[in-house]
Structure formats: C-alpha cells, structure tokens
Amino acid sequence: MAGGIVAVPLLGFSLLAVALIIERAYFWSQIQLRQNRLVNDVLKLYRSNPPGAIAKLKQNADLPMARIFLEALCLEGATPTEFRLALESATQAELPLLKRFNTLFQTIITVSPLLGLLGTILGLMRSFSSMSLGSTTAANASGVTGGISEALVSTVMGLVVAIATLLFANVFRSLYLRQFALIQEQTGQIELVYRRFHDQPEEKEYATSR
C-alpha cells in the first residue's frame, strides 16, 4: 500500500468520518426543514387548542424541540415554576443528542495528522535503511524512492482526513450553537404563553372545552 501500514487506520478513520458526517447531515437537515415550522404552529395552536397542540407535538416526537415541549406540556396542573423547570431539564436531556459524535470527530481530527506523521517517519526510516554507501543500484534507488513515496502519501492522507473532518465538525458545531440559541428562545416563548394561559383560568376552560 502506497501509504504504508498507517494507511490502514487512516482509511478506517476516513470511512468512519464519512458515516458520521452523513448521519449528522441527515439529523440537522430534518431539524432545519421541520422543527421551526412545527414550533411556530404549536405556539399558535396552543393559545386556542392545547390538546391539539400536544397531539401535533406527539406526531413529531422525533424532533428535539417537540420532546422538550411535551415534557412540560404533559405535566398536569403544573405551576409556571414547575413548567419552567420541566423545560430546563428536558433541554439538558436533549443536549447530548445535539452534540452527538463530537468526541469522535475531535479524535479523528487530532489522531489523523499524528498517524500521517508516523507514516512519514516510517517511510524515511525505510528510505535510510535501503541506502548503501557507494551503491547506486536500481534496487537501492527503488527502495529509497519507495520509502519517500510512503512518507509523502501518509502525510497527505492524514492531513486530508483531518482537514475534511474539521470542516464538517465546525459546520455541525455552528448548527448546534444556533439550535441551542433557538431552544432558549422558543422555550421562553412557550413559557410565556403558558404563564398567560395559567393566569387566566376562565380562558383555559373555554379553550379546553372547544
């Protein structure tokens, strides 16, 4: 193999990175396409039809924001304080899912260049071991060039895997930060609606009876 023995783990890292990138890309695409529209619909619907809003959330329970809202809205007779605590605890429970695979991404980004460097050293060692003082035979020259080629290929492979993974990891991190800010905003909105709803029991009875 052109990159030497370190090409094997680097190839494994590249395949793993591709699989993780595809999973995260699908996850975030679903959130971007569906979640904001769902939250807006639920906020409007809850003012007039709370059971209908809860039913709509249950239909989209695969989305993090739907699970967060359900955790609080399904509490019977919750005070505004209890409602807020339920939102906060549900938000904390969803954060690991939003940050999923971050550790693996960082491992690939960190280890891949080191493996490339290791391949460089092994390739140079092979080149030096093939050199014989005063010898200019074809076999000797082939061993030297083969070792240098191994050193260069392993370095390039390590850098390519690390750089490509870093770019996607940064994109996913920016999506996570944006989503976290939206969660703070949207949980605040549903809490405000619930407080108004809780403070007007006659409106609540009317909406529930509809």
Curated annotation (Swiss-Prot):
TM annotation in the entry: 2-22, 104-124, 152-172
Keyword annotations: Cell inner membrane, Cell membrane, Membrane, Protein transport, Transmembrane, Transmembrane helix, Transport
Main location: membrane
GO terms of biological process kind: protein import
Pfam families: MotA_ExbB
Entry membrane topology: Multi-pass membrane protein
Localization terms from the record: Cell inner membrane
Keyword DNA repair part of the UniProt annotation: no
Keyword Cell inner membrane appears in the UniProt entry: yes
Signal peptide limits: none
Family the UniProt entry places it in: Belongs to the ExbB/TolQ family.
Purpose of the protein: Involved in the TonB-dependent energy-dependent transport of various receptor-bound substrates. Protects ExbD from proteolytic degradation and functionally stabilizes TonB.
Protein name: Putative biopolymer transport protein ExbB-like 3
